[in-house]
């Protein structure tokens, strides 16, 4: 991932999942979620983005620190399928700042990076209060994924 940040501007294409099973807007069709995400990823790759990130942006309310297991499991399955077809850097983001779940998912699917919304600063909003987590991920360097603070940069592993 270090070569990804060579000083040139990059475009990271976002694959926003449809609402996941723990969400009130979930329509009960996990195959539709998978297919929609794969089509988005293929389109982004075909359009020449530099990297892809998978995110559960359509889940409301967004939970602070972790998401329900049924959503996490389906999101991990989708991430694995996207990783299999993705020849460019691939990352995951779980709203809001589910750093530990993101780290484990990235490790499980061989993702290249994660995105953390509250890396060095505390955040508050409709999701509740999220303390900065910059010290906690450093204890989990057993995986090869790279992590990035929100709009701040990051550290290589």
Q: Each predicted region: which residue ranges?
A:
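Alpha-helix-loop-beta-strand connector modules within alpha/beta enzyme cores
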Residues: 2, 7-8, 13-14, 63-92, ...
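Conserved, mostly hydrophobic/aromatic
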Residues: 13, 44, 52, 114
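Conserved anion-binding
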Residues: 17, 100, 104-157
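A short, N-terminal amphipathic alpha-helix
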Residues: 36-48, 81-84
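Glycine/small-residue-rich loop that forms an oxyanion/phosphate-binding "nest" at active or ligand-binding sites
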Residues: 75-108, 113, 123
